[in-house]
């Protein structure tokens, strides 16, 4: 009887020993994976970084874009013609800025520069229109009758909106709605 008790205790000890060994190996694997994930997160990447904007929690914008009220804005540092600006914005899956609210105008007030925006004269409709074909708000913009129809529209806080030759090179703002 004493021999069977010793054998039973040895079997139980061996069973719990193997179980402990398995748990130690599993813990080691988890710790190793944890350090690997931390290293990946802290390693700089060559791909564009998506940053959630502090201003608005409903959108994420690419690096060098600014988030404001669920839209992303790219403010150029280089100058292009109106057409070149529009083409650049299109290549970024966006369009030239279409101002829709006074709040957006105040967002623009941080810069004194003149920027191309997305208003152009549509000869077929004999009207100034945004790129998407809608009319600019009369609350935000005065009459366009003072502008030459062969010119393009830009905006600056000091000049409000004004027209210039579309071939002039100016900075521009692209706007991208959330997808």
Swiss-Prot record:
InterPro entries: C-type_lectin-like, C-type_lectin-like/link_sf, CTDL_fold, NKG2/CD94_NK_receptors, NKR-like_CTLD
Source species, domain of life: Eukaryota
Pfam families for this protein: Lectin_C
GO molecular function: carbohydrate binding; HLA-E specific inhibitory MHC class Ib receptor activity; MHC class I protein complex binding; MHC class Ib protein binding, via antigen binding groove; protein antigen binding; transmembrane signaling receptor activity
Bilayer topology: Single-pass type II membrane protein
Ranges annotated as spanning the membrane: 11-31
GO process annotations (BP): adaptive immune response; natural killer cell mediated immunity; negative regulation of natural killer cell mediated cytotoxicity; negative regulation of T cell mediated cytotoxicity; positive regulation of natural killer cell mediated cytotoxicity; stimulatory C-type lectin receptor signaling pathway
Keywords, comma-separated and alphabetical: Adaptive immunity, Cell membrane, Disulfide bond, Glycoprotein, Immunity, Innate immunity, Lectin, Membrane, Receptor, Signal-anchor, Transmembrane, Transmembrane helix
Subunit text: Can form disulfide-bonded heterodimer with NKG2 family members KLRC1 and KLRC2. KLRD1-KLRC1 heterodimer interacts with peptide-bound MHC-E-B2M heterotrimeric complex. KLRD1 plays a prominent role in directly interacting with MHC-E. KLRD1-KLRC1 interacts with much higher affinity with peptide-bound MHC-E-B2M than KLRD1-KLRC2. Interacts with the adapter protein TYROBP/DAP12; this interaction is required for cell surface expression and cell activation.
PANTHER family per UniProt: C-TYPE LECTIN PROTEINS (PTHR22800), NATURAL KILLER CELLS ANTIGEN CD94 (PTHR22800:SF252)
Name by which UniProt lists this protein: Natural killer cells antigen CD94
Source organism: Rattus norvegicus (Rat)
């Amino acid at each position: 009887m004493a021999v069977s008790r010793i054998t039973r205790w040895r079997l139980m000890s061996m069973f719990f020993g193997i179980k402990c060994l398995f748990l130690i190996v599993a813990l080691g694997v988890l710790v190793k994976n944890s350090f690997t994930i931390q290293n990946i997160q802290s390693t700089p990447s060559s791909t564009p970084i998506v940053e959630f904007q502090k201003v608005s929690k409903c959108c994420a914008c690419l690096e060098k874009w600014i988030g404001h009220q669920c839209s992303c804005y790219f403010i150029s540092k280089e100058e292009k013609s109106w057409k070149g600006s529009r083409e650049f914005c299109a290549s970024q899956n966006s369009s030239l800025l279409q101002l829709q609210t006074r709040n957006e105008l105040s967002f623009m007030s941080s810069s004194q520069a003149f920027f191309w925006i997305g208003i152009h004269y549509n000869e077929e409709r004999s009207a100034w229109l945004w790129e998407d074909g809608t009319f600019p708000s009369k609350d935000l913009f005065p009459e366009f009758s003072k502008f030459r129809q062969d010119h393009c529209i830009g905006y600056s806080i000091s000049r409000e909106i004004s027209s210039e030759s579309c071939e002039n090179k100016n900075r521009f703002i692209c706007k991208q709605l959330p997808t």
